[in-house]
Amino acid sequence: MVLLRVLILLLSWAAGLGGQYGNPLNKYIRHYEGLSYDVDSLHQKHQRAKRAVSHEDQFLRLNFHAHGRHFNLRMKRDTSLFSDEFRVETSNKVLDYDTSHIYTGHIYGEEGSFSHGSVIDGRFEGFIQTHGGTFYIEPAERYIKDRTLPFHSVIYHEDDINYPHKYGPQGGCADHSVFERMRKYQMTGVEEVTQTPQEKHANNGPELLRKKRTTSAEKNTCQLYIQTDHLFFKYYGTREAVIAQISSHVKAIDTIYQTTDFSGIRNISFMVKRIRINTTADEKDPTNPFRFPNIGVEKFLELNSEQNHDDYCLAYVFTDRDFDDGVLGLAWVGAPSGSSGGICEKSKLYSDGKKKSLNTGIITVQNYGSHVPPKVSHITFAHEVGHNFGSPHDSGTECTPGESKNLGQKENGNYIMYARATSGDKLNNNKFSLCSIRNISQVLEKKRNNCFVESGQPICGNGMVEQGEQCDCGYSDQCKDECCYDANQPEGKKCRLKPEKECSPSQGPCCTAQCKFKSKTEKCRDDSDCAKEGICNGITALCPASDPKPNFTDCNRHTQVCINGQCAGSICEKYGLEECTCASSDGKDDKELCHVCCMKKMEPLTCASTGSEKWKKHFLGRTITLQPGSPCNDFRGYCDVFMRCRLVDADGPLARLKKAIFSPELYENIAEWIVAYWWAVLLMGIALIMLMAGFIKICSVHTPSSNPKLPPPKPLPGTLKRRRPPQTIQPPQRQRPRESYQMGHMRR
């Protein structure tokens, strides 16, 4: 008994530690690790970066180890997300807000990596894109409350996000009936009869306008107005955290849209022009349209649309509300012509007599009582903006591969504009389908010149080597680089390599301070579970991609194997087997439900635990268990820390009752039974008629009637009581009460 208690305490302690594999963070995040770097040191670096005294201080460096690899972040203040006119409005105050806590950067020496986030009170929050996928970092107290922890932040990989509603009947966007009502309403907009000089010019000389467009800078940036309600502020706590969340969402969709070719229209980007933060103090403000706690998703979008948003490309409201049917967002769908709504739409009068701006949308970060991971919220934002850009939901086999019966296509998942929310871990989840690209390109061709602005060009002097630059060491008072011309030099010379210089340290870690490429033997990146250490190649300043370790090398604490440099294969593949799910059946030990199980290829009947006698020659009797939080029993439950499969009822009792009552199969079965047993139905009908006749006959004596020939109705209580024989009423004999009682008793 004592040993059992000690074991339980040890398991509970292990479950609470960060950095241990198999820690589920919530029902959507299956595994996380804790981070406990020095927050005071990072805060001091952040303060130095704000002042930017030297070239080195411009960059914020953060180093830590997690998920079996080293992160060496090199970041710089991100000003690309906010326009020159950016303002923050809160509680009737307009502020010229300092966004110096927003950073963007990369992993030093890892080509193609990218990071974005914020530094608040010495803690970094954001996402890091690597060759092995995207990692997310958030404050620990956002998930783990009322506990003393040895770490202050949590980090998890996108593959560990398990969003159960991604292919379910609920979750994500509104259903078809809602969009149909919205579409009909959009058709009722009354167009303004006045014509702007630009439109007159377009009508009088389209060829001239087309020529001017080709010679001038392209308008490809959509400016945003973002509002947050008091519930969103209540969840994140501070103004800095709210702006960090907005920045993270905008950067996420900016990355998706910039890398998409919309039929020749490229580099579509986003920039925040204005933010309105409704704090908890605004909850009682009568001028705050979002103050009420119980607002449906359609009404919430309508409240946003009732404001005038003519100065913006799009206007969104972020909230923390649990809308019905798992809706995460809603937006008006744009069209090239014939309908109002979408990007650049101006305020106009509609059939209900109200003026509205239909260049709007809403986003919530809560779903079915839990807060969704940032990855899901980012994809939702990209999805709703896709509606504004003119794309309806994907349909048809070409654009919904996740519904395909072909396993190869199904494995790639659905695209961004799929009707239901996705977890973002599939190949297609961050891409637009061909259907969406065709629709969006038509709307962009018609509308983007009405409100889009020119995008910011690469800036020489920001310390980051961008397109068109050979190097970038900053301005003259910051540049300590002997290899690169600083930003104060004339055009054609600044941000270029000096004569006879091979490289610049600003290009990457494989360049020396003497402007020479490092030799082929120098290390530029530490090794990981599945990749060898990075070695300079002697011909470039960037750290080349690391050579992968041999396929089927054990990784992830011997639970997986390396495939082409990524820890992505099952341990079963090492022995020519396939991973399978141990499902419960007669005679099967329920403990095996949380074991890693393998089977021979294309032979499901051979599925057995790694600890079984069948696979003893491969695993030597060693049982490999699934990680806590992993699905088990054919996805009908999840494994807890005690390696027990806990069954999950995803629908709930009310949903099951509704399905049982209104199921078409139920009525089909009843109809078949009636046809087969018609004589039983006839007997039941006769019995029911006789029962009703008897009931009427019995109750008729208690029913009042206006017929004077019928006896008066009998009272029902008197009928139900036990009757006694009638007695002659005599005056009470006070002197002999006991005798009267005895006589009555005898009569009975």
Curated annotation (Swiss-Prot):
> In which domain of life is the source organism classified?
Eukaryota
- Which Gene Ontology molecular function entries are recorded, alphabetically? endopeptidase activity; metal ion binding; metallodipeptidase activity; metalloendopeptidase activity; metalloendopeptidase activity involved in amyloid precursor protein catabolic process; protein homodimerization activity; protein kinase binding; SH3 domain binding
Question: Residue positions of the PTM Phosphothreonine?
Answer: 719
Protein name as it appears in the record? Disintegrin and metalloproteinase domain-containing protein 10
All copies of the Disintegrin domain together span: 457-551
**UniProt GO cellular component terms:** adherens junction; axon; cell surface; clathrin-coated vesicle; dendrite; glutamatergic synapse; Golgi membrane; Golgi-associated vesicle
- Tissue-level expression: Expressed in chondrocytes.
Role of this protein: Transmembrane metalloprotease which mediates the ectodomain shedding of a myriad of transmembrane proteins, including adhesion proteins, growth factor precursors and cytokines being essential for development and tissue homeostasis. Associates with six members of the tetraspanin superfamily TspanC8 which regulate its exit from the endoplasmic reticulum and its substrate selectivity. Cleaves the membrane-bound precursor of TNF-alpha at '76-Ala-|-Val-77' to its mature soluble form. Responsible for the proteolytical release of soluble JAM3 from endothelial cells surface.
Under PANTHER family, the record lists: ADAM10/ADAM17 METALLOPEPTIDASE FAMILY MEMBER (PTHR45702), DISINTEGRIN AND METALLOPROTEINASE DOMAIN-CONTAINING PROTEIN 10 (PTHR45702:SF4)
Per UniProt, subunit arrangement is: Forms a ternary EFNA5-EPHA3-ADAM10 complex mediating EFNA5 extracellular domain shedding by ADAM10 which regulates the EFNA5-EPHA3 complex internalization and function, the cleavage occurs in trans, with ADAM10 and its substrate being on the membranes of opposing cells. Interacts with the clathrin adapter AP2 complex subunits AP2A1, AP2A2, AP2B1, and AP2M1; this interaction facilitates ADAM10 endocytosis from the plasma membrane during long-term potentiation in hippocampal neurons.
This enzyme catalyses:
Endopeptidase of broad specificity
Peptidase M12B domain segment(s): 220-456
Per the record, which residues fall in region Disordered?
Answer: 704-748
Q: What is known of its domains?
A: The propeptide keeps the metalloprotease in a latent form via a cysteine switch mechanism. This mechanism may be mediated by a highly conserved cysteine (Cys-173) in the propeptide, which interacts and neutralizes the zinc-coordinating HEXGHXXGXXHD catalytic core of the metalloprotease domain. The dissociation of the cysteine from the zinc ion upon the activation-peptide release activates the enzyme.
Site annotation (Cleavage) points to 213-214
Which SUPFAM superfamilies does this chain map to? Answer: Blood coagulation inhibitor (disintegrin) (SSF57552), Metalloproteases ('zincins'), catalytic domain (SSF55486)
Q: What class of enzyme is it?
A: hydrolase
Species of the source: Sus scrofa
Active site feature: 384
Q: Which residues cross the membrane?
A: 673-693
Q: Which SMART domains match?
A: DISIN
Induction info: Up-regulared in chondrocytes culture by interleukin-1 and reduced by retinoic acid.
Q: What positions does the record give for the motif labelled Cysteine switch?
A: 171-178
Signal peptide start and end residues:
1-18
Enzyme Commission number(s) of this protein? 3.4.24.81
Membrane topology type, per the record?
A: Single-pass type I membrane protein
